[in-house]
Amino acid sequence: NWNFSIQDEKEEEEDNLSEVTEDDILNMFTHVSPCKCKKERITVDMATTGEDNFVMKHWVGFHCDDIQYCMKNSNLEAVKMIKQFMVKHGLTDKELIIDVQGNGFLKEIFNLVSANGGGVAFSGAIAATAKGKKLYERFKDEAAHLATQMIKAGLITYDRQLAKMRYTHQKLKLESSTLTAEQMQFESRIFKFKRLPSGRIQFEGKKEQHALIKGFSPDLTDNIIMLCGGLCYDCYRELAGATGGEL
């Protein structure tokens, strides 16, 4: 669909039952990070289809200060861009969090075995962590729910100037681009969960997510989910500190 515009979508707004509101997203660009965690990380969301964007973000703890994306690239070009982004921020393999579902070859190029001092090979399909296994079906459910809580608690933050960074996508109208903050507001409608008969929490499936955001892939928000998965125990600590309780 070459004729899609996020502005058109605003005019025919439907009920948005997402747990993350557009205001929650805007608030991320107006706060200085309150988090104690200062671990530097690079999250990488590979483009898995011809219409996804390849998106990388640099984080200091849960504060993002740099975003780079590409609409069209080969696997080789993606690897080169990841390496350049690492050099730019002075980081090594051990600070990487890469979504490897459908991109297993990356595990051979980068050291993504954390037990061997490497980075995180993010795979949402694996089991939830020891801390989350009673509450979540899969790791993706846990990471997405942690991301939701972190956003709502004001613990995920972005440099203000990134809100006005131009962002474009193959599915947007040819002549149009949007702003990063607007695209993230649009993508935020994916943050929907249901309670299974087992009592566990399940995140909206990929197919449903695509329907909620008109066939787009949530490339910008996926990076937040990956960060919260890669630093899940830090998330639990930050949330406990922010709420004054044990999570």
What are these regions (language model features)?
Residues K39, F54, K94, T221:
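Residue-level detector of short, conserved catalytic/binding motifs and their immediate flanks
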Residues V60-R200, A242-L247:
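Mg2+-dependent endonuclease catalytic cores in nucleic-acid-processing enzymes, primarily RNase H-like
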